[in-house]
Amino acid sequence: WGVVGALIFTGFLLWRREAQRKPLATAALTGALFWAATAGTITLIEQQARGMPDVALHSLNGEAVHMDQLAPGQPLVVNLWATWCPPCIREMPVLEEAQHIYQDVAFVFANQREQPETIRSFLEENRLNLNNLYRDDQAQLARAVGSNGLPTTLFYNAQGQLIDSHMGELSRATLARGLEKIRGPDQ
């Protein structure tokens, strides 16, 4: 409300005092730009420092597992995907390979709203062997992290803080950059 009040007051002064219109307009514009930049930076920092959401995923057998139980004390890559999503399908071999190469990082595959039979058939047809495969039955994880599309890949550090995210198909280079951020440059 303070910003709205300041804008109304500035508008009143601009209307009443013709000689001060240009300096007041310049000051108001500068202040508004500074406020917008600061608010944007704070929002970005808050988003990047978010912890793991309090969401339960389900194994293909129906067992519930909370996000914070997936890889305590270990960097974590979470991939939100679906069998009907072409970019998800194209990136799966990259992620499957990475889960074997980067043993110090846990890779979790959170299928969005599909039945276990559909997921099993997809894995068999595509000859994929994915560890840590779960279902996000109600897309709670997607909502909690603000994902607006698939695939979405989340990169958490060993302390459970969201360090980076990527929406869209993941290339080897993009995956490597995300892994460097959560593992450290020397690993």
Language model features: what each stretch is:
Residues 1-54:
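N-terminal targeting signals for export/organelle localization
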Residues 54-76:
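A short beta-strand-turn-helix
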Residues 59, 80, 110-111, 133, ...:
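Small/polar loops that bind or transfer phosphate-bearing groups
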Residues 77-78, 107, 153:
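Hydrophobic beta-strand anchors of alpha/beta hydrolase catalytic cores
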Residues 80-97:
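Conserved redox-active cysteine motifs that mediate thiol-disulfide chemistry
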Residues 100-138, 150:
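Conserved segment of the thioredoxin-like fold in thiol-based oxidoreductases
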Residues 124-129, 136-186:
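Thiol/disulfide oxidoreductase modules built on the thioredoxin-like
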